[in-house]
Amino acid sequence: MVTIRADEISKIIRERIEEYNREVKIVNTGTVLQVGDGIARIHGLDEVMAGELVEFQEGTVGIALNLESTNVGVVLMGDGLLIQEGSSVKATGRIAQIPVSEAYLGRVVNALAKPIDGRGEISASEYRLIESPAPGIISRRSVYEPLQTGLIAIDSMIPIGRGQRELIIGDRQTGKTAVATDTILNQQGQNVICVYVAIGQKASSVAQVVTNFQERGAMEYTIVVAETADSPATLQYLAPYTGAALAEFFMYRKRHTLIIYDDPSKQAQAYRQMSLLLRRPPGREAYPGDVFYLHSRLLERAAKLGSLLGEGSMTALPIVETQSGDVSAYIPTNVISITDGQIFLSADLFNAGIRPAINVGISVSRVGSAAQIKAMKQVAGKLKLELAQFAELEAFAQFASDLDKATQNQLARGQRLRELLKQSQSAPLAVEEQIMTIYTGTNGYLDSLEIGQVRKFLVELRTYLKTNKPQFQEIISSTKIFTEEAEALLKEAIQEQMERFILQEQV
């Protein structure tokens, strides 16, 4: 007969009672009233906060944007095809956040930081809010370090500094994305983390950019955030903030970052679509009233941090497309007023074969020479002045039939200077090569050459200087000054190469 031991039974019962945890969980729920066009109207959810994430019964997540007296307007982060009228919705008590880590380098992700390159999951132990506040005034310091783009026209006359926001603006097909991608390619070996955000682009265009980065080894230090044209409006609206959150992760770890937004006008269109479907009152060009805040809170996150926060930086290059050169439209004027300058690309210059098609006359950097090394300041001042005078003379020369010799010489010099600013795509130049190119042009060494020979001569001169006068590059990179010794080496190289070049051309 089995003996029942009362003490054992009572011990087991006590243990079970101790383990019992009666947790009462209050969940804020609601019911779907209607759903469609990426928008859901919810009844209930009384305690929900603006911007809070809500979860639908079938797993779709949305963001509560409109808090009205009778219902809540939610934008869906997905197609929401399985959401039914009358199904339940619960508030999560969280706002949108993404995982962040070093493992994101070299990957292509969507607006929720989920990989879309088919290379498996990305490990991350830390999270950042998609919309985190920008650094305050005390946390920042003024921009003083150059961020080299590798493009002579920009680095000499419209310099960009680390922590600056510089707008790239122009009509479609004027090479705006090419300027941005060349800047990323030029960061190789500069210890700069790059983030390229593609908003509402064609999938083929994004694939082309990624392939370009992979072929040139730029994906090692680059993250691509992509939401293509067929993505829901909510995800196109979130993509730039996701890119900024990934860049901030590195910025607050004392690193330098560069973020390209391509382009914020598509984000504004997605936000306009969401706002109109939520029945928010339309304003100018049917955009909602807070479209300025949409971009200002994004671009203000770019900063040069002070010494207390580790001196990291985030440089932002937003790209905005204009319609037939109209920079006075709503979104272009908004972004111009937020940024620290703009690089204007002209369709006329592009079609005339001047590429990159940068209109130097109306482009501006509000940081200026603070974002240049001393050597560049020494040679670039003369270039900008001579090009400005040339532009003025060229307009005048169209009406004048007989020009004096001095004017003819000035026009000839200007044409050669314009020629030296031309560069092939995906061929950024080191700052030493740029200084050498500008010096050669502004000091009249190219005046004796035909316009068609200028680029060929400069390419050969760069090669000659690298192989025969490596000290020149060493002096500039170590001292950052265009010393007398460097100038003597350069003059010598130009004269030697000019003799060789003339002999070659005669043969």
UniProtKB/Swiss-Prot annotation:
One matching Pfam family, short form? ATP-synt_ab_N
Q: Which InterPro entries match?
A: ATP_synth_asu-like_sf (IPR023366), ATP_synth_asu_C (IPR000793), ATP_synth_asu_C_sf (IPR038376), ATP_synth_F1_a_nt-bd_dom (IPR033732), ATP_synth_F1_asu (IPR005294), ATPase_a/bsu_AS (IPR020003), ATPase_F1/V1/A1_a/bsu_N (IPR004100), ATPase_F1/V1/A1_a/bsu_N_sf (IPR036121)
Q: Which cysteines are joined by disulfide bonds?
A: none
Q: What is its EC number?
A: 7.1.2.2
> Single GO molecular-function term?
ATP binding
Q: Spell out the family assignment given in the record's similarity comment.
A: Belongs to the ATPase alpha/beta chains family.
Matches recorded under HAMAP family:
ATP_synth_alpha_bact
The record ties this protein, via NCBIfam families, to: atpA, PRK13343.1
Query: What name has this protein been given in UniProt?
Result: ATP synthase subunit alpha, chloroplastic
Q: Which organism is it from?
A: Daucus carota (Wild carrot)
